[in-house]
């Protein structure tokens, strides 16, 4: 391990990440770093000179951390990176702000177009990276630009076009830490916005296992198809490997039944991919990110 950069925030060595993920599985971070503020993060990156490998971490909602943990430094942005501000008819939102919190803020301030965020777990930063979407809307529809630091500490901005949004992804460089997202503002009726959000919440609670240890949608929907239908057709509803299972309620969700390992979940996902391909000839692609070392 190289000498760690001098910081104002805090380091934690051999830090268990399991409790930070929705699946509640996975190994430790070799070094866990929460920057104090923007200047602290920038200083760390400049001092590091890309010597230590860096992994960024959001709310842990759409990720499997493998049981062997993560080498290098895991960076998690905290409360100093979750602010919501108005400026010139735009919203400027910190990347660690939860999607749900932004949806609630917009409802309270009669801003329309953000209703779908109430049903998307995770942070704004993760939502941008995934081009997260639901109910006919996605991040690409509301983003103006993003602000970021690269792993060398250079400050960069990217417009909506430069981000290169695509279905559940983008064309941004991989060595970025997103800091803020700028959104366009369209005024609406607060009560109508609330009704839309309540409808989304009701739909989610009746069709998705939101009270279970899950990580959201497991696979990207193939063009013109639904992953859950393909999984169900392959006879895998409720299928188990170790402590992991396919949800009985929604086949595109995996569940930790209480004692699953990251390996159980990843093995289950790969088994599903194999069986769906054998049954339908369709190759499912992971939506859930898998990172870290195998044991």
UniProtKB/Swiss-Prot annotation:
Q: Give the main localization category.
A: cytoplasm
Family per record: Belongs to the MurB family.
Its annotated compartments are: Cytoplasm
Q: Which organism is it from?
A: Rickettsia prowazekii (strain Madrid E)
Q: In which pathway does it act?
A: Cell wall biogenesis; peptidoglycan biosynthesis
Residue ranges spanning the membrane: these are none
Per UniProt, what is one Pfam family of this protein?
FAD_binding_4
Name its GO BP terms in alphabetical order: cell division; cell wall organization; peptidoglycan biosynthetic process; regulation of cell shape
Using the record's annotation, list all stretches that form the FAD-binding PCMH-type domain. 24-188
The annotated active site, in chain numbering, is 168, 217, 287
Gene it is expressed from: murB
Q: What is this protein called?
A: UDP-N-acetylenolpyruvoylglucosamine reductase
């Amino acid at each position: 391990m190289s000498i760690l950069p001098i910081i104002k925030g805090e380091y934690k060595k051999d830090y268990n990440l399991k409790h930070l993920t929705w699946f509640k599985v996975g190994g430790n971070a070799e070094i866990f770093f929460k920057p104090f503020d923007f200047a602290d993060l920038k200083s760390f990156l400049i001092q590091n000179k890309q010597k230590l490998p860096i992994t960024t971490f959001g709310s842990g909602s759409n990720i499997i951390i493998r049981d062997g943990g993560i080498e290098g430094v895991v960076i998690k942005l905290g409360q100093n990176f979750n602010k919501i501000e108005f400026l010139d008819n735009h919203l400027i939102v910190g990347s660690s702000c939860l999607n749900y919190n932004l949806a609630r803020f917009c409802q309270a301030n009669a801003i329309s177009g953000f209703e779908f965020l109430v049903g998307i777990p995770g942070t704004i930063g993760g939502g941008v990276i995934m081009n997260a979407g639901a109910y006919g809307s996605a991040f690409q529809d509301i983003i103006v630009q993003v602000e970021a630091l690269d792993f060398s500490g250079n400050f960069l901005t990217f417009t909506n076009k430069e981000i290169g949004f695509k279905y559940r992804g983008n064309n941004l460089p991989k060595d970025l830490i997103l800091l803020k997202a700028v959104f366009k503002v369209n005024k609406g009726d607060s009560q109508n916005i609330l009704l839309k959000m309540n409808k989304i919440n009701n739909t989610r609670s009746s069709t998705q296992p939101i009270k279970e240890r899950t990580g959201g949608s497991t696979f990207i929907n193939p063009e013109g198809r639904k992953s859950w239908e393909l999984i169900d057709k392959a006879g895998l509803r409720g299928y188990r490997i170790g402590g992991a299972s396919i949800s009985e309620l929604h086949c595109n969700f995996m569940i930790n039944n209480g004692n699953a390992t990251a390996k159980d979940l990843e093995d289950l996902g790969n088994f599903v991919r194999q069986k769906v391909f054998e049954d339908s000839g369709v190759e499912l692609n992971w939506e859930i990110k898998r990172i870290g070392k195998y044991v």
